[in-house]
Amino acid sequence: HVDHGKTTLTAAITKVMSLKGAAQFMAYDQIDNAPEERARGITIAIRHVEYQTDKRHYAHVDCPGHADYIKNMITGAAQMDGAILVVSAPDGPMPQTREHILLARQVQVPAIVVFLNKVDMMDDPELLELVELELRELLSKYGFPGDEIPIVRGTARNALESPSKDINAPEYKCILELMNAVDEYIPTPQRAVDQPFLMPIEDVFGIKGRGTVVTGRIERGKVKVGDTVEIVGMTNDAPRRTVVTGVEMFQKTLDEGIAGDNVGCLLRGIERTDVERGQVLCAPGSIKPHKKFEAQVYVLKKEEGGRHTPFFSGYRPQFYIRTTDVTGAIGLPAGMEMVMPGDNVVMTIELIVPVAIEEGLRFAIREGGRTVGAGVVTKILD
């Protein structure tokens, strides 16, 4: 929630970790004056900091404004493997706290650790217990394991303002406890390269005498010559299976391509007309084509280059999914008349053609090539 101390905590973490030589200290105003970035056509003020514990290296993001947080979570500008929920003890959970927990659930943040801030302002230990209880209930209500989530108590400002260079100074204890909780409780994510193969197809070429080559950047997993793969999406037909007979990168032949590589894959028995941009090449059965899904969507304000007017159920924009635009119709929840620019809503979307989709997939909503919103798939409906 605004003023609960997210930015103070971020600065305090970099300070304490810098005493261990495991981070570069970043002052409050450096974080607060966050640079703007673009993600899926949306501008977001976002500050990245990094630090190292004994166990892991962390990339941590902080956003100055509430709207920036929402945009960051929905666009997935920063991939989140976990989150620190900062709550001011004297204030307790506030409406934005609920919204953040709900969004974290919707966009599939795997784990949350809580930092209960400003506890020095609480004289009554029973009140502190109540705030903690309320938080655990709130987390459970939105599908997180409220009973087992670590809640670390402390005062970020005291850690930030302390003159001490001794990492064992009492005012730093809460920050070290928090880092320990993050290390122990937030699971290590599976690396992209260890997940099933998937490459969004960006381009298709016919090569005389050799067959059809599809190019793109491998999103996850790996591919090697001889692998059986599927071509999924952009058609009502079942996915086609084929065999990769060559993998190339910058005109060089490779044994295999891995997540992050830009490659060309030569496909056996596939005509130039059988494949198109917007389809994906993937490990068989690893992703299915769908038309209908539920999504959490942020609609751009007019000042952000979005629409100037609301839209209603039945609105048919383009959905930019991975590499291409697909037309679809929007359905609003019961009782919701319309969506205003700047709103953050759950909606159902039905595309005119099935596309390779899974929960957690990010997309942009466009109108005549201009981004008017961003969303994340929260539930497949067909």
Curated annotation (Swiss-Prot):
InterPro entries: EF-Tu_GTP-bd (IPR041709), EF-Tu_GTPase (IPR050055), EFTu-like_2 (IPR004161), EFTU_2 (IPR033720), G_TR_CS (IPR031157), P-loop_NTPase (IPR027417), Small_GTP-bd (IPR005225), T_Tr_GTP-bd_dom (IPR000795). Keywords: Cytoplasm, Elongation factor, GTP-binding, Hydrolase, Magnesium, Metal-binding, Nucleotide-binding, Protein biosynthesis. It catalyses: GTP + H2O = GDP + phosphate + H(+). GO terms for molecular function: GTP binding; GTPase activity; translation elongation factor activity. The gene is tuf. Its EC number is 3.6.5.3. It comes from Chloroflexus aurantiacus. Its main location: cytoplasm. GTP binds at residues 1-7, 62-66, 117-120. The keyword Protein biosynthesis applies. It is found in: Cytoplasm. It is an enzyme of class 3 (hydrolase). This is Elongation factor Tu. Mg(2+) binds at residue 7. HAMAP family: EF_Tu_B. Residues 1-190 form the tr-type G domain. Monomer. GTP hydrolase that promotes the GTP-dependent binding of aminoacyl-tRNA to the A-site of ribosomes during protein biosynthesis. Belongs to the TRAFAC class translation factor GTPase superfamily. Classic translation factor GTPase family. EF-Tu/EF-1A subfamily. It holds the Pfam family GTP_EFTU. One of its GO terms (cellular component) is cytosol. The lineage of its organism: Bacteria, Bacillati, Chloroflexota, Chloroflexia, Chloroflexales. PANTHER family: ELONGATION FACTOR TU, MITOCHONDRIAL, ELONGATION FACTOR TU-RELATED.
